[in-house]
Amino acid sequence: MSRNLFLSITNFIRNLESLFLPHGGHPPALALAGFQHDHSPKSSQEFSLKQLIGDGLLWAVPKHRRSVEKRLKRKFGYPEYNWKPLREKRNLRSCLQCGHDHEMGVLCPFCYQKVLKETELMQSKIQETLGLDPVDKEVIVLYEGEKAEQSTDDLKNKRIVEMKKPRPMWFTKNLLQKSTQQLSETKEVKPSDLA
C-alpha cells in the first residue's frame, strides 16, 4: 500500500515538473562562465525496431521469481512421483544358477538368453526335419545319447526330432513335459486319492 502511494506521488511530481519546466528538469544550480548550456529538446529520431529490441536480452527476462520450494521441486523432482537424483536399488538379487545380478521378480536375463538360444535351436531343427506343415502329432526332441523311453506303439502317434549335441545340464527332461493335464473321464474319488 505504502509503496503504491509513494510511486503515485513521485509520478505526480514528475508530471508537474514536466509541465512547468519544459527543458527536462531543474535549471542548473551552478553554471561556469564561458560555457553555453543548450536546453533545446533532442531532435526526434526515426523509430526503428532495432533500437527497440536492441540485443534482445531484456525481452527474455522472467517477470516473477520462482519460490524456493518450486525451484527445488524442479531441480530434484517429487519423491513420491519422480525423484531425479540417483538412488541405490535395493531389489537386486544374484542368480543362483549363473551368479549374474537381476531385479527381484524378474527372470535372470543371462539365463533367459541361454534358454532362448536353446529354444531357437530346437525350433530351427524341428523346422528342418518337419518343414512348415502344420503339426498334427506331438513332437519329441531327443538329444545325443538319449533313447525314446516310450513303447513303439506310443511313438507311432508322435514325431521324433533328434538334436546332434548333448543335452545341456540345465535343460532337464521335465521341461518338455506338458504343464496342463487332460481332464479325467472318471468322477469317482477313491479314499486313498484324497490326501
From Swiss-Prot:
Keywords: Metal-binding, Mitochondrion, Ribonucleoprotein, Ribosomal protein, Transit peptide, Zinc
InterPro entries: Mitoribosomal_protein_bL32 (IPR051991), Ribosomal_zn-bd (IPR011332)
Primary location: mitochondrion
GO cellular component: mitochondrial large ribosomal subunit
GO biological process per UniProt: mitochondrial translation
Subcellular location per the Swiss-Prot or TrEMBL entry: Mitochondrion
Residues noted as binding Zn(2+) in the record, renumbered to the chain: C95, C98, C108, C111
Positions in coiled-coil regions: none
GO-annotated molecular function: metal ion binding; structural constituent of ribosome
Reported function: Component of the mitochondrial large ribosomal subunit (mt-LSU). The mitochondrial ribosome (mitoribosome) is a large ribonucleoprotein complex responsible for the synthesis of proteins inside mitochondria.
Subunit composition and interactions: Component of the mitochondrial large ribosomal subunit (mt-LSU).
Family: Belongs to the bacterial ribosomal protein bL32 family.
Name this protein carries in UniProt: Large ribosomal subunit protein bL32m
